[in-house]
UniProtKB/Swiss-Prot annotation:
It comes from Arabidopsis thaliana (Mouse-ear cress). The lineage of its organism: Eukaryota, Viridiplantae, Streptophyta, Embryophyta, Tracheophyta. The gene is ACO1. This is Aconitate hydratase 1. Induction: Slight level decrease after 3 days of iron starvation. The modification N-acetylalanine is found at residue 2. Binds 1 [4Fe-4S] cluster per subunit. Belongs to the aconitase/IPM isomerase family.
Length: 898
């Protein structure tokens, strides 16, 4: 059990410059350990957290030593516990998290406890940004029209989240129409340094969205996790992570005139993809850092998932402090942040000699080498220099189908297709732009590129250029601040004139919420098999993500989005070909509309003001009239509607008592599914559309839901009945029980019946039979999806026996009370002669004190086979979760006892 922190002796007072104290803090220098000076700054944040939270139970002294000895331990894949300071959610992932909290309150109440104790123990911020679609564009009424449609579609989900914002303490819900979660986090939510009841410590955050990494640009350690990990963090539990290697990325020089942060981030993404940084931190340093604005850094940090790193970290320096003042943080707060970080060796001063920091590996980029570029047509790291774009496009048309190929026959590459657009004859060719979107927190958080785009629009309008009316243009700012500085600059009217009117404040086109393109354009593309293009200032461009009909999708800076919209095609050499013809008949080139760095800097200086941030965020939680008119119950216990197909009370705590059930072995269990290698979380719990013949579809139709209103599994994550039916429902899943047949079915072994996985699981349950899963290597790889653990638990799966597990999925299985077992090295189901038709018994002691992390466990089958597996409960804390039947049950019982 927990004991007093053994590091209390290094708790020091932090003095204010003018007398008095800011508070107390755990002083890293007071350890008197020379290894600290060599640690990357990102690792120092992990070290401080381990020291502050050390209780010899959840976090142990040996964990602190592992981090201190990072230079030697990081190559060895050692695991450490980490307790982030706060949690960040968006609405798609936030709904199931709030469902779980509401259900826990009911369980507390039923057990005679105080249900109001179920509150997040760390601050939780939930920003509703994933639901708005670009139904209406090129209209100054677009914001209101799109918001009304958003509320019509999502009224039930929004009402539930609004109830949660009132019912739970320590939970802030930012209503729809306010901005994009990561930009709001950067401009407002991030603390950088916490002061909680007089204890100072670094801000850190985990979020249920991969681009949580954007906050690393502000010197706040943050990355994306799965839902169960996020819920566990909310409730005070540590998350388990491998102590990462750190790639040092040195920046030198400065960007040349006309280069943008987007050009830089696409260059960095390509370099890091080539280097290989999966599972690692990347830490930026060097004298070139002085030349990067905070917004530039945030752009680079945002795309960490695209270059594969856990984080792209920028330590706090003077630029960070300037940004904090600009965005309305008080002078006292900024003074405290600087004093704390300097005192604890977490502040970088580039006017001083570079520190002795050691990195796992190193890269270097001279900023002067960055050139204008885009990325595409199908992957974020496929960078194309602008000067090579036309040639690259033609090679893509030629190449066989792949990441850089469309296999368009030579004779068809130059064909022009005529179509009727609002009574006018128009033409489309391969490469023509049909969507041009200034979108995504990656770029809309950066005033330089946003105002740069507005300057391009002004120059284009002054010269008489126009955007073709069938191109779907849109501007979706990540916060209301963008609207204010565009208005202050007087440049928004030029964007409007070109069709880039504001369509909403949310993720929109970047996550595929691009809405329909004009019917005539869509027909021309489909009927003639055209490779149409989208150009967007987003962070992902995988085929089919932006829009089903744009097979070529290019990531570009906001100014380049405007330029390509004006050109109307990606099949252009901006250096030699005109972008269009001006009002005097003169040819206009790219260089005629491109602003200089000086022009951009001047308009940023005069238009982006601290008062804008204060005015925007003072009212951030108030919401609009539609949000305020949503009527919700005032109680702290949720009133579940049994008819709802979006929000449903899950059965996790049914029959729960105050006594932990204790460890349970598995007796005579059938193998529900028998898998090979690389079963991903998308195989286990798909997020996409609900197939018309699936158990989930049947459930919805029985409740009167029309097929066109099925929506996706992702949107229905608040309903366990649908998600359980969607477990193992991937149409591409391969189950050895089916002997070569592909699809979401299995065999009910006693009868030989071929059934859907859900129906087979329910049949076993009705017969009183446990089930297990057999699998190969890398079970649970891919997205850290919590329903990939919740779903199997609801199907009655008691254990998974595999060659290896993906790290996050293993911890999610533990959190849901499922036993993870690994075959011994060199063994698997095949080498052991297991067919999956056997009955399996897993022998475990009845007392958790007799079980040790990582111990050997014997598995016996009914045909006399016996083999040994490694029990993948890796820590004593995980054994405690198992003893209680899962992490949420563990938390409930502990809160009642307190």
């Amino acid at each position: 059990m927990a004991s007093e922190n053994p590091f209390r002796s290094i708790l020091k007072a932090l003095e204010k410059p003018d007398g008095g104290e800011f508070g107390n803090y755990y002083s890293l220098p007071a350890l008197n350990d020379p290894r600290i000076d060599k640690l990357p700054y990102s690792i120092r944040i992990l070290l401080e957290s381990a020291i502050r939270n050390c209780d010899e139970f959840q976090v142990k002294s040996k964990d602190v030593e592992k981090i201190l000895d990072w230079e030697n331990t990081s190559p060895k894949q050692v695991e450490i516990p980490f307790k982030p300071a706060r949690v960040l959610l968006q609405d798609f992932t936030g709904v199931p998290a709030v469902v779980d909290l509401a259900c826990m309150r009911d369980a507390m109440n039923n057990l005679g406890g105080d249900s109001n104790k179920i509150n997040p123990l760390v601050p939780v911020d939930l920003v509703i940004d994933h639901s708005v679609q670009v139904d209406v564009a090129r209209s100054e009424n677009a914001v209101q029209a799109n918001m009304e449609l958003e509320f019509q579609r999502n009224k039930e989900r929004f009402a539930f989240l609004k109830w949660g914002s009132n019912a739970f303490h320590n939970m802030l819900v930012v209503p729809p129409g306010s901005g994009i979660v990561h930009q709001v986090n950067l401009e407002y939510l991030a603390r950088v340094v916490f002061n909680t009841n007089g204890l100072l410590y670094p801000d850190s955050v985990v979020g249920t969205d991969s681009h949580t990494t954007m906050i690393d640009g502000l010197g706040v350690a943050g990355w994306g996790v799965g839902g169960i990990e996020a819920e566990a963090t909310m409730l005070g539990q540590p998350m388990s992570m491998v102590l990462p290697g750190v790639v040092g990325f040195k920046l030198t020089g400065k960007l040349r005139d006309g280069m943008t942060a987007t050009d830089l981030v696409l260059t960095v993404t390509q370099m890091l993809r080539k280097h290989g940084v999966v599972g690692k931190f990347v830490e930026f340093h060097g004298e070139g850092m002085r030349e990067l604005s905070l917004a530039d850094r945030a752009t680079i940090a945002n795309m960490s998932p695209e270059y594969g790193a856990t984080m792209g970290f920028f330590p706090v320096d003077h630029v960070t402090l300037q940004y904090l003042r600009l965005t309305g943080r008080s002078d006292d707060t900024v003074s405290m942040i600087e004093a704390y970080l300097r005192a604890n060796k977490m502040f970088v001063d580039y006017s001083e000699p570079e520190s002795k920091t050691v990195y796992s590996s190193c890269l270097e980029l001279n900023l002067e080498d960055v050139e204008p570029c885009v990325s595409g047509p199908k992957r974020p790291h496929d960078r194309v220099p602008l000067k090579e774009m036309k040639a690259d496009w033609h090679s893509c048309l030629d190449n066989r189908v792949g990441f850089k190929g469309f296999a368009v026959p030579k004779e068809a590459q130059s064909k022009a297709v005529e179509f009727n657009f609002n009574g006018t004859t128009a033409q489309l060719r391969h490469g023509d732009v049909v969507i041009a979107a200034i979108t995504s927190c990656t770029n809309t958080s950066n005033p330089s590129v946003m105002l740069g785009a507005a300057l391009v629009a002004k120059k284009a309008c002054d010269l008489g250029l126009e955007v073709k009316p069938w191109i779907k243009t849109s501007l979706a700012p990540g916060s209301g601040v963008v609207t204010k500085y565009l208005a202050k600059s007087g440049l928004q009217k030029y964007l409007n004139q070109l069709g880039f009117s504001i369509v909403g404040y949310g993720c929109t086109t970047c996550i595929g919420n691009s809405g329909d393109i004009h019917e005539a354009v869509a027909s021309a593309i489909v009927d003639n098999d055209l490779v149409a293009s989208a150009v967007l200032s987003g962070n992902r461009n995988f085929e089919g993500r932006v829009h089903p009909l744009t097979r070529a999708n290019y990531l570009a800076s906001p100014p380049l989005v405007v330029a390509y919209a004006l050109a109307g095609t990606v099949d252009i050499d901006f250096e030699t070909q005109p972008i269009g013809t001006g009002k005097d008949g003169k040819q206009i080139f790219f260089r005629d509309i491109w602003p200089s760095n000086k022009e951009v800097a001047e308009v940023v200086q005069s238009s982006v003001l601290p008062d804008m941030f204060k005015a925007t965020y003072e009212a951030i939680t108030k919401g609009n009239s539609m949000w305020n008119q949503l009527s919700v119950a005032s109680g702290t216990l949720y009133e579940w509607d049994p008819k709802s197909t979006y929000i449903h009370e899950p059965p996790y705590f049914k029959g729960m008592t105050m006594s932990p059930p204790g460890p349970h072995g598995v007796k005579d269990a059938y193998c529900l599914l028998n898998f090979g290698d690389s079963i991903t979380t998308d195989h286990i719990s798909p997020a996409g559309s609900i197939h018309k013949d699936s158990p989930a579809a049947k459930y919805l139709m029985e409740r009167g839901v029309d097929r066109r209103d099925f929506n996706s599994y992702g949107s229905r994550r608040g309903n366990d009945e649908i998600m359980a039916r969607g477990t193992f429902a991937n149409i591409r899943i391969v189950n050895k029980h089916l002997k070569g047949e592909v699809g979401p079915k299995t065999v009910h072994i006693p009868t030989g019946e071929k059934l859907s996985v859900f129906d087979a699981a329910m049949k076993y349950r009705n017969e009183g039979r446990d089930t297990i899963i057999l699998a190969g290597a890398e079970y649970g790889s891919g997205s850290s999806r919590d329903w990939a653990a919740k779903g199997p638990m609801l199907l009655g799966v008691k254990a998974v026996i595999s060659k290896s597990f993906e790290r996050i999925h293993r911890s999610n299985l533990v959190g849901m009370g499922i036993i993870p077992l690994c075959f011994k090295a060199g063994e698997d189901a095949e080498t052991l002669g297991l067919t999956g038709q056997e009955l399996y018994t897993i022998e475990l002691p009845n007392n958790v004190s007799e079980i040790k992390p990582g111990q050997d466990v014997t598995v016996v089958t009914n045909n006399g086979k016996s083999f040994t597996c490694t029990l993948r409960f890796d820590t004593e804390v995980e054994l405690a979760y198992f003893d209680h039947g899962g992490i949420l049950q563990y938390v409930i019982r502990n809160l009642i006892k307190q």
